[in-house]
Amino acid sequence: NGKPFCYGVFYHHGWAAGRSEGAALNAVSSIPKWLHGTDVVVVGHAHAKTGTKLAAFEPDWTCGQFRKRRIAAGITGSYMLWGSYGRERGYAPKEEGATVVKLSGKRKEAKIVL
């Protein structure tokens, strides 16, 4: 429609408890419950290098209804190879490197690229 738009992006060191990828995804998926207006949420800490799509309902004050906001959520990979810490504590090796967020310039759409 030619109208400008902007993205709400939240990057954080993160937190997660547990050894599974699911534990890390649970941590990142809880953020839109208390931080409204985000289109992209990316955290670290778990070093899981994964992503998912989330959704949240938010009030649209222009029409007095709720609308669904689509949220791209990701976790960054590690920047250390599987070394002493992970090996000594029995963690499985993780994927290294950044989680990339691709923002569309034509429509309001964000994707996590692994």
Regions found by a protein language model. Give the residues of each.
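Extended recognition/assembly regions associated with phosphoester-bond processing machinery
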Residues: N1-L114
